[in-house]
Curated annotation (Swiss-Prot):
Keywords: Amino-acid biosynthesis, Aromatic amino acid biosynthesis, Decarboxylase, Lyase, Tryptophan biosynthesis. This is Indole-3-glycerol phosphate synthase. The keyword Amino-acid biosynthesis applies. It catalyses: 1-(2-carboxyphenylamino)-1-deoxy-D-ribulose 5-phosphate + H(+) = (1S,2R)-1-C-(indol-3-yl)glycerol 3-phosphate + CO2 + H2O. It comes from Neisseria meningitidis serogroup A / serotype 4A (strain DSM 15465 / Z2491). InterPro entries: Aldolase_TIM, Indole-3-glycerol_P_synth, Indole-3-glycerol_P_synth_dom, Indole-3-GlycerolPSynthase_CS, RibuloseP-bd_barrel. Pathway: Amino-acid biosynthesis; L-tryptophan biosynthesis; L-tryptophan from chorismate: step 4/5. GO terms for molecular function: indole-3-glycerol-phosphate synthase activity; phosphoribosylanthranilate isomerase activity. The keyword DNA-binding does not apply.
Length: 260
């Protein structure tokens, strides 16, 4: 595990402890049970595939640890509507505040503005956060294999599925496959950013494809335009999580539209 990931996870543990002190586990479960009905994240992706279209998970991201502030003019409802109008399948919204300048309010605002399903993009280290995600209105959660042990992955997935949510499992390399082998989610993402060097290469996804036969594979990071999309589709990958390319565009709707 890298130093930056360790730092993020240490801070996240402190954050979750404070959140539990403010809203206890019983209360967050009750809020999750009362949340708006789940929108099918995996269903929306499969709907695009049935139309022979790339399924784009479009990300709402203000900043990142490596790039700093990405989009100063940051209005989640407007961004969400641009994504929906352009044909995105789903949204991904950063809720981590210390490192990505995210917020649960951004997730709520984005979901209220559109009919698309929404992923909570964060560092999930406690099942409390899965209930929390549903309470905020999220339809899917990200589980990062590099950040979790086998037992945590299996438990958090079970909680998400009990709540009707989709799980996007994120891998970085083959070493993480073994601890994920009992997971049942159909949605397996590969982050093309090398955790050691932070270099981005689509080869990360390609190298894992043989091991992910039968899964709906999401390629994450490093997709910069239609040429990348068409290249990955030629290799059998039809689902794309894209953030920074869109966030830096003057006209987000037009930028997304270029992929179709």
């Amino acid at each position: 595990m890298t130093d930056i990931l360790n730092k993020i996870l240490t801070a996240k543990a402190q954050e979750v402890a404070a959140q539990k002190a403010a809203v206890n586990a019983e209360h967050i479960r009750a809020l999750a049970a009362e949340a708006a009905p789940v929108r099918s994240f995996i269903g929306s992706i499969r709907g695009k595939h049935r139309l022979n279209l790339p399924a784009v998970i479009a990300e709402i991201k203000k900043a990142s640890p490596s790039k700093g502030l990405i989009r100063p003019d940051f209005r989640p409802p407007e961004i969400a509507r641009a994504y929906e109008n352009a044909g995105a399948a789903c949204l991904s919204v950063l809720t981590d505040e210390p490192y990505f300048q995210g917020s649960p309010e951004y997730l709520k605002q984005a979901r209220e503005a559109v009919s698309l399903p929404v992923l909570r993009k964060d560092f999930i280290i406690d099942e409390y956060q899965v209930y929390q995600a549903r309470a905020w209105g999220a339809d899917a959660v990200l589980l990062i294999a590099a950040a979790l042990e086998r037992e945590q992955l299996e438990r958090f997935e079970a909680v998400a599925h009990e709540l009707g949510m989709t799980v996007l499992l994120e891998l970085h390399d083959e070493s993480e496959l073994e601890k994920c082998r009992n997971l049942t989610t159909p949605l397996w993402g590969v982050n093309n950013r090398n955790l050691r060097t932070f270099e981005v290469s689509l080869d990360q996804t390609l190298s894992l494809l043989p091991a992910l036969e039968g899964k709906t594979v999401v390629t994450e990071s490093g997709i910069t335009g239609k040429a990348d999309v068409e290249f990955m589709q030629s290799r059998g990958v039809h689902t794309f999580l894209i953030g920074e390319t869109f966030m830096r565009a003057d006209d987000i709707e037009a930028e997304v539209g270029k992929l179709f």
